[in-house]
């Protein structure tokens, strides 16, 4: 997400961002189903048609899906897939095609919460003055405190897409720096004294920036795990939406303040 400065403050630039992010999510979800096929899921844990070996253990199933790049989040995703696959087997519905489609469908709906620092009213200095003049001072203060966001000139989903296609580690470095810029902006903004009637909006932008920074870090940490990446991209979409919403609400506060 990139930002530019206007007289009203910071405005998000996100033309085509939603479509592009969803396209990237589809690509990574496709990687999930491909990974299932490549790891021989059908041969590894399809129950025999007859005999005493009714079903192999969950451990064997996980081993069949595991890879060197597997992460904790990816393992959790696999656990869910395993449970679904075993259910398909028990119902006699399992085929390699159904299995791959199931993995893809699950990747489209699963989400994972990402822990992040949460600011509360107790963390913020509040001014009882809610005048128009005070709002103007507050807006100028925010333009200074949010300046680190101006370093984020390339959409984060685009950077991650380049990594997915090229595996160039420089792109992961860019994502890490973008996350740091969000945290730096949040830290500086937390030290701004806020008009009492803007406190809720202020907390909104602080927490959304921390959430988005944590999501970017999680994407970097799980970049080579297609299972985790597919889930985290949905978390990314939500985090980005939260940032955009928080700034839109703040802009509305500016507009509605009367002199």
Protein language model regions, located:
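Structural signature of transmembrane alpha-helix termini at the membrane-water interface
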Residues: 26-36, 216, 223
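A loop-to-helix transmembrane entry motif
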Residues: 169-176
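Membrane interfacial helix-start segments of signal peptides and signal-anchor transmembrane helices
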Residues: 2-32
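Short, solvent-exposed, charged loop/turn and helix-capping segments
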Residues: 185-203
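Extended amphipathic alpha-helical scaffold segments
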Residues: 179-189, 216, 220
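Juxtamembrane proline-rich low-complexity "stalk" or linker regions positioned immediately after a signal peptide
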Residues: 32-108
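C-terminal amphipathic alpha-helix
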Residues: 95-168, 198-259
């Amino acid at each position: 997400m990139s930002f530019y400065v206007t007289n009203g403050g910071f405005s998000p630039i996100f033309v085509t961002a939603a479509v592009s992010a969803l396209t990237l999510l589809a690509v990574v979800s496709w990687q999930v189903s491909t990974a299932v096929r490549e790891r021989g899921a059908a041969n590894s844990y399809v129950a025999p048609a007859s005999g005493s070996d009714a079903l192999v253990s969950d451990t064997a199933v996980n081993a069949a899906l595991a890879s060197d790049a597997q992460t904790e989040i990816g393992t959790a995703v696999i656990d869910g897939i395993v449970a679904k696959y075993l259910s398909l087997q028990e119902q006699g519905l399992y085929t390699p095609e159904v299995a791959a489609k199931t993995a893809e469908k699950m990747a489209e709906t699963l989400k994972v919460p990402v822990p992040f620092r949460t600011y509360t009213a107790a963390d913020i200095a509040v001014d009882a003055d809610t005048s128009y003049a005070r709002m103007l001072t507050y807006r100028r203060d925010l333009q200074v405190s949010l300046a680190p966001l101006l370093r984020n000139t390339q959409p984060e989903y685009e950077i991650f897409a380049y990594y997915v296609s090229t595996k160039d580690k420089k792109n992961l470095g860019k994502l890490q720096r973008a996350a740091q810029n969000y945290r730096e902006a949040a830290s500086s903004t937390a030290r701004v004294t806020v008009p009492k009637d803007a406190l809720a909006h202020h907390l909104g932008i602080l927490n959304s920036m921390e959430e988005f920074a944590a999501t970017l870090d999680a994407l970097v940490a799980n970049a080579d795990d297609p299972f985790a990446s597919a889930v985290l991209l949905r978390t990314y979409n939500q985090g980005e939406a939260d940032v955009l919403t928080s700034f839109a609400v703040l802009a509305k506060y500016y507009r509605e303040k009367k002199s």
